[in-house]
């Protein structure tokens, strides 16, 4: 809603099977209903100007690691903002750091994302 209040455009993309269990924001500029999670991710990737990763569960973790991997592979150059509130995502940063240290990865997550740890810093990104 904050993005809409400042003139931003918000597009929601939700698979049909999640419509009943999820809260759909009726204020979105547009809501797109798709059949599969893969279709959802494809549309989010195509339409997104940046990727904002909030604390979440297994679906969020899967989507986050995919978009991070795509950036590492050079598939996109869009900003990735990680809201690391109360160090929620610290273990993810640690995994990428360990991969680099162990020579299984070339990039640490810190170098390709914006790590935001406080609500005030998070809000300042959008003002």
Predicted regions: what they are:
Residues 68-70, 99:
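Glycine-rich, phosphate-binding/catalytic loops in enzymes
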Residues 70-78, 104-106:
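Arginine/glycine-rich "motif VI" loop of SF2 helicases in the C-terminal RecA-like domain
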Residues 59-66:
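Short glycine/serine/threonine-rich phosphate/pyrophosphate-binding segments
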Residues 16-18, 56-59:
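Short glycine-rich anion-binding loops that position phosphate/pyrophosphate groups of nucleotides
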Residues 1-47, 83-127:
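A cross-family phosphate/adenosyl-ligand binding-site feature
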Residues 49, 76-78, 111:
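Short glycine-/polar-rich loops that comprise or flank the Walker A/P-loop
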Residues 55, 74-84:
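Short, proline-centered helix/strand-breaking motifs
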